[in-house]
Structures are given as structure tokens and as C-alpha cells.
């Protein structure tokens, strides 16, 4: 289960020699090993209107994950700087990004199409997930409080300083249960591992083993059956 799109998750997983299906975009899409979508739950027009209103009111830029790649309302240079910081291998402090860092940033940034607003995403594009990064943690808390008034939108975070938004039916835990049910796998036979708030929907009692990583957020450790050392 990943918050990433298939295109972002597959190279990492396959590079480790693992061959499997993928629950992507925080549960909004389930894909076969070769990337064919089996099921998908996009954001509805009502979801999009609420997300646009709340994030725009707060001055928050968006990464918009769609059927046609990622659209971004951030100013291009600002988004690129955030990507550099995310992938920094220590070379930024020396004032000269390493070749490996430049390559990573170029590869990641190539997936983005920059637009002025959510309304500029081409008509007919299916939108699965919207997120934003490097937000003050207290602002994330306030945003989640505002979205709590939208019961058909699920909110999550990989870090305390980001926010991820999907349809309420598109959550990792729900997608994992559906995936297992189709294959006659009982929840009690499943081991779940996670480290952040966006894994919470999988950390429910019916799963046999819920394992929080040693560096997991406290909210996950509080509900996990086990914790790594």
C-alpha cells in the first residue's frame, strides 16, 4: 500500500526484487503488477469543490494526482526547490547539488504539469488525490479540523507538515480489505506495517498483525499490536 501513484511505487518495489500488485494513491487505485488498474475511486465533483475552497482560502498550493499524471499549482521554481530538499543527499549544504541529486529531481519533476489552479486541469481528467507539502504543522491541524466538516473526504499525512486528501472510500485499510476479500484472504492472516498517520486506516483490530516501525508517528504506535526495535 502506497500513497504514491503506480509510476512512483513500482520502480522502488520492483528494484528490490518484489513482484506484487499495488494499492496506490492511498487506496484510490488498485493495480496489477504491470500497472493495469483493477479498481479506482476518484474524488467527486463535490469533493473537489470543497478541497479547492478550503485549500485556496488557506493559501495552500496543490499537487493534483490524476489519470494524466500530476498537475501542480505551485510556482514552478518553488516546487523544484521543495523537490531538491526532499531528495537532498547532503550536497545542497556544499552549494552544489550532486549528479545523483540532479538526476533524482529531474526524474521526479518530469511527472509534473504546472497549472494556475485546480480549475485549469483539463476537462475530463480523473482526479484521485490532492496533496500539499511543507505546510506548518499547526496549519495542517487547522486544515484537518476544517475538512472534518466534509465527511466524504479522507485526510491523512505522511509527515506532520503535509496533507493528503482522497474520497472517504479511498483509504488504504478499506482497499486492503477489498483486495484480500477478492482473494479469499482473511484479515486475520494479514500483516500490516506502517510508520505514519496515512497508515492508520490499516491499523484496525481485525488485521492479524499491525506493526509500527520504530520511528513511526506516535498516533500509529498507540494503536499498533507490535512495534519494531
Regions found by a protein language model. Give the residues of each.
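Acidic, Mg2+-coordinating phosphoryl-transfer loop and its flanking beta/alpha structural elements
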Residues: 2, 176, 186-229
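Hydrophobic packing residues within well-ordered alpha-helices of enzyme cores
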Residues: 9-13, 143, 220
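Conserved acidic, metal-coordinating active-site core of Asp-based
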Residues: 58, 65-191, 202
Amino acid at each position: 500500500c502506497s500513497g504514491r501513484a503506480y509510476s512512483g511505487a513500482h520502480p522502488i518495489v520492483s528494484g528490490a526484487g518484489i513482484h506484487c500488485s499495488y494499492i496506490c494513491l492511498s487506496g484510490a487505485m488498485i493495480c496489477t503488477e504491470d500497472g493495469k488498474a483493477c479498481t479506482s475511486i476518484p474524488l467527486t465533483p463535490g469533493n473537489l469543490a470543497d478541497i479547492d475552497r478550503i485549500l485556496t482560502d488557506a493559501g495552500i498550493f496543490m499537487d493534483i494526482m490524476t489519470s494524466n499524471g500530476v498537475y501542480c499549482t505551485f510556482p514552478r521554481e518553488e516546487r523544484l526547490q521543495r523537490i531538491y530538499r526532499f531528495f537532498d543527499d547532503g550536497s545542497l549544504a556544499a552549494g552544489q547539488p550532486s549528479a545523483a541529486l540532479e538526476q533524482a529531481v529531474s526524474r521526479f519533476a518530469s511527472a509534473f504539469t504546472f497549472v494556475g489552479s485546480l480549475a485549469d486541469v483539463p476537462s475530463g481528467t480523473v482526479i484521485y488525490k490532492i496533496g500539499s507539502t511543507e505546510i506548518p504543522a499547526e496549519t495542517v491541524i487547522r486544515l484537518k479540523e476544517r475538512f472534518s466538516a466534509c465527511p466524504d473526504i479522507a485526510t491523512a499525512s505522511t509527515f506532520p507538515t503535509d496533507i493528503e486528501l482522497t474520497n472517504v472510500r479511498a483509504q488504504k485499510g478499506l482497499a486492503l480489505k477489498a483486495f484480500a476479500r477478492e482473494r479469499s484472504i482473511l484479515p486475520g492472516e494479514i500483516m500490516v506495517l506502517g510508520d505514519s498517520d496515512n497508515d492508520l486506516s490499516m491499523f484496525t483490530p481485525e488485521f492479524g498483525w499491525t506493526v509500527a516501525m520504530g520511528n513511526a508517528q506516535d498516533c500509529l504506535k498507540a494503536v499498533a499490536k507490535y512495534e519494531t526495535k
